[in-house]
């Protein structure tokens, strides 16, 4: 009797090995239902703290809690078989000390079943990245426009548009790579700088509003599907589901009011008497 082989999940070493090779494909995911649809087509899924804005209507990601990330991370892991799953560490869960970061990252790994966590920041959190990786927790880094620091940055501003900013951002990239991160997200960054960083470090770069020369790309799923009312410049909508959802809701409302739904085929009949 043949036994169907289980689908093998993408691993951290496989992501690292894609440096300079076939581009790495990624999207965000926040719950099991949509994760099932996109799982076969991506290399990793990011359960991003952007869920605070996308799913909960928050103005920023700062209000997202560790418990929220764990709940959504677990849902995405349950809904996937193939993609490596990375979960964001939310604001306030890792900055205080490497020890606290490790404690919280352990919770994320244990309670979600994900493979890795993502931390925002460069040189300032390199010590924490090193501390986690030495203790068996894979870390994806995130530099450039870091949404958890928008209060300091003064908003969602593209980074590196002036050459005077390049040295600090390049130092961030080198610091996280040397600390042991297996990949780094480059967000909201001038294209020439993102391309330059990609050539400078030996770990994959994942671009979002960065450069086509990055080793991979990521988008927020809802942006890619056309569900965001004001998508950023770097977003390409591969579908227009927002308009389709509105159209479907309008058609449903009309059918209910006209009493054409539910029709006979949508109702249950009595059992025939014996």
Curated annotation (Swiss-Prot):
Protein's UniProt name: 3-methyl-2-oxobutanoate hydroxymethyltransferase
Catalytic site positions: 187
InterPro entries tied to this protein: Pantoate_hydroxy_MeTrfase, Pyrv/PenolPyrv_kinase-like_dom, Pyrv_kinase-like_dom_sf
Gene assigned in the entry: panB
Residues the record lists as binding 3-methyl-2-oxobutanoate: 49-50, 88, 118
Keyword terms, alphabetized: Cytoplasm, Magnesium, Metal-binding, Pantothenate biosynthesis, Transferase
EC number: 2.1.2.11
Subunit details: Homodecamer; pentamer of dimers.
A GO molecular function held by the record: magnesium ion binding
């Amino acid at each position: 009797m043949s036994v169907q082989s289980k689908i093998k999940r993408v691993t951290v070493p496989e992501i690292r090995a894609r440096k300079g090779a076939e581009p790495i494909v990624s999207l965000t995911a926040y719950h099991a239902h949509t994760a099932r649809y996109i799982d076969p087509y991506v290399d990793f899924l990011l359960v991003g703290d952007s869920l605070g804005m996308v799913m909960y209507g928050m103005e920023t990601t700062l209000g997202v809690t560790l418990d929220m990330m764990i709940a959504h991370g677990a849902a995405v892991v349950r809904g996937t078989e193939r993609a490596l799953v990375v979960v964001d560490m939310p604001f306030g869960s890792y900055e205080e000390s490497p020890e606290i970061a490790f404690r919280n990252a352990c919770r994320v790994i244990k309670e979600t079943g994900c493979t890795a966590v993502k931390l925002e920041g460069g040189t300032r959190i390199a010590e924490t990245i090193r501390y986690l990786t030495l203790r068996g927790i894979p870390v994806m880094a995130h530099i450039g426009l870091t949404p958890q620091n928008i209060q300091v940055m003064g908003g969602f501003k593209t980074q590196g548009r002036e050459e005077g900013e390049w040295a600090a951002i390049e130092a961030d990239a080198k610091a996280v790579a040397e600390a042991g991160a297996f990949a780094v997200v480059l967000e909201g960054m001038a294209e020439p700088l993102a391309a330059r960083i990609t050539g400078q470090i030996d770990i994959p770069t994942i671009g979002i509003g960065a450069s086509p020369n990055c080793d991979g790309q990521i988008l927020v799923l809802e942006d890619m599907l056309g569900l965001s009312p004001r998508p950023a410049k770097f977003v390409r909508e591969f579908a227009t589901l927002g308009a389709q959802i509105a159209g479907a809701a309008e058609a449903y409302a009309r059918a209910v009011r006209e009493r054409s739904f539910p029709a006979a085929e949508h109702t249950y009949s009595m059992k025939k008497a014996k």
